[in-house]
Amino acid sequence: HPNVPEKCDPTNLPILGQGIAIKTACSQSYAGDAEAVAILTALCQAAHVPYQYFVNRSDMRGGSTLGSLLSAQLPIRTIDIGIPILAMHSARELMGTADQQALQQLTAAFFTEA
């Protein structure tokens, strides 16, 4: 977020309009492993879906999802993905419509290939 640049790594941030974000964290606050990332990346490439990577800062607690909990409790491969959002959880969030379209395209490709 531009108002708190000290919370962000300027070399590693999701960009609005550049596709879905594949999220990982060394703290395991996001679900996924190298194999899941490779499978998703291959699916994105085959379906011509734009994607980017987001890695939480390792020196600061970041967001988390239920993905890690689910992957630990269920015998299914799990990976956290999302649409880049500016000012998440604020009164006015901002996203790129192209990213939503990319997510819809990826979802259709996933269920077609599955």
Put a short name on every predicted segment.
Residues 83-114:
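His/Asp/Glu-rich mid-to-C-terminal helical/loop segments that flank catalytic regions of hydrolases
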Residues 3-92:
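Active-site-adjacent substrate-binding region
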